[in-house]
């Protein structure tokens, strides 16, 4: 699933390519991709004639503000891709939504697993009232509110493994399996450590590691282990420099011990028993 760095990479690409271009129409090939409004016709009527002022990111959500004061929301979920293409490009078999722009360009939503969603929120409506998941999000790791005190308060009363807690979007918005593993390695904390057992100094290290790992991945254009592509169809490069994620059985880059993998809360967790305690 695309996580914060991948979504941020897409956001930056969209801001470079799509702003202030008139939307001339669209085509919805899979109706359930449109979460709101209920009518696909209303969705297409809403976007047509409008233009995008800016793309924003909240956690793993993409939100486009428009010149009509409306919002276009997108969540990539597991396999979603937003690609900027010429309208005459052959359709990928997993194309779900096409948004046409002037100059024969289009924003194409491709989604193999079909869990991705799009929303059109008309002007005058609160975006959180329609995209209800936004109200449940924690603060962003790049927000000034993401302090050591904030993270400590979120973690200390939870009797569950630290890795599981970090995947909870009400604890840290945008963090997922890849970067939780990477941040825990960088901070020296084992993924199965209970939140109640994590010391304040470890939380300080963890907060710093989360920010550093996310920044490094954004600079690398995100991570591509399966489906992620940026808006130009290019893979992310963070996987080549990952410390532990997807490296089970390989030597630790710090101590040389073997990277291990366990299942924790139904998700794979990668770590080094020597570097993490």
UniProtKB/Swiss-Prot annotation:
Leader sequence residues: none
SMART domains on file: Fapy_DNA_glyco, H2TH
Keywords: DNA damage, DNA repair, DNA-binding, Glycosidase, Hydrolase, Lyase, Metal-binding, Multifunctional enzyme, Zinc, Zinc-finger
GO terms of biological process kind: base-excision repair
Cofactor list: Zn(2+)
Active site per database record: 2 (schiff-base intermediate with dna), 3 (proton donor), 60 (proton donor), 267 (proton donor)
UniProt cross-references to Pfam families, sorted A to Z: Fapy_DNA_glyco (PF01149), H2TH (PF06831), zf-FPG_IleRS (PF06827)
Coiled-coil zones: none
Zinc fingers classed as FPG-type: ranges: 243-277
Transmembrane domains' residue ranges: none
Entry-linked CDD domains: EcFpg-like_N
Gene Ontology terms for molecular function: 8-oxo-7,8-dihydroguanine DNA N-glycosylase activity; class I DNA-(apurinic or apyrimidinic site) endonuclease activity; damaged DNA binding; zinc ion binding
PANTHER family in the record: FORMAMIDOPYRIMIDINE-DNA GLYCOSYLASE (PTHR22993:SF9)
Listed HAMAP family: Fapy_DNA_glycosyl (MF_00103)
Subunit details: Monomer.
Family: Belongs to the FPG family.
UniProt protein name: Formamidopyrimidine-DNA glycosylase
Gene: mutM
